[in-house]
Design a protein with these regions (language model features):
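Cleavable N-terminal signal peptides of Sec/SRP-targeted secreted and luminal proteins
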Residues: 3-21
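A broad, low-specificity signal for short, low-complexity segments enriched in glycine/proline
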Residues: 14-15, 22-28, 82-85
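Plant P/S/T-rich low-complexity glycomodules
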Residues: 20-33, 145-151
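N-terminal secretory signal peptides
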Residues: 27-69
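Short, surface-exposed beta-strand-loop junctions and turns on beta-sheet-rich folds
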Residues: 69-73, 129-130
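Membrane-insertive, amphipathic helical modules of secreted toxins and fusogens
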Residues: 73-81
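Helix-rich interaction surfaces within compact, conserved domain-sized segments
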Residues: 81-151
Length: 151
């Protein structure tokens, strides 16, 4: 069960990374970063509410900005989003993810990739991988602000 929760946290982290584009919100055909996630076959719920800005480059590299760092609790795990996240997004794959981590026991572990396989999302961290049903991420969670995490 702990692995299931870790995967959920990893998925949320991956979503956040997927949100960026070379296109800024004002010039993007997508009005929100959440719509952009759906273009790449990811549910909007892998990214928390409150994204302030995003950018996506032609090569799939992206950046996402929140008002500040925040944490959510998912299935017994705590997931931390930094104020700025980045990675690379392709259809059904977010890799090179930075700025999202999960607390495993007493240690924070970076989530580095999220993959979609059918109706499952697979979250990858350095020490663990976990899969969750895509339908568990239909809505974006609210994030609890963490002042000590810089934007």
């Amino acid at each position: 069960m702990a692995n299931h929760h870790l995967l959920l946290i990893l998925l949320v982290s991956a979503s956040a990374a997927t949100s960026l584009a070379s296109v800024t919100p004002s010039s993007s055909p997508y009005s929100t970063v959440y719509e952009l996630l759906e273009k790449y076959s990811f549910p909007r719920g892998i990214l928390p509410e409150g994204v302030q800005d995003y950018a996506l480059q032609r090569d799939g590299s992206f950046e996402v900005s929140l008002p500040g760092g925040c944490e959510i609790n998912v299935g017994g795990f705590t997931l931390r989003y930094e104020g700025n996240m980045h990675g690379n997004i392709q259809s059904m794959l977010i890799n090179e993810l930075a700025g999202v981590s999960v607390k495993v026991a007493i240690k924070w572990v970076s989530i580095n990739a999220v993959e979609r396989h059918g109706d499952q999302l697979i979250f990858n961290a350095i020490v663990i991988s976990k899969s969750f049903p895509v339908n568990k991420f239909s809505a974006s969670p609210r994030c609890n602000r963490v002042p000590e995490i810089a934007k």
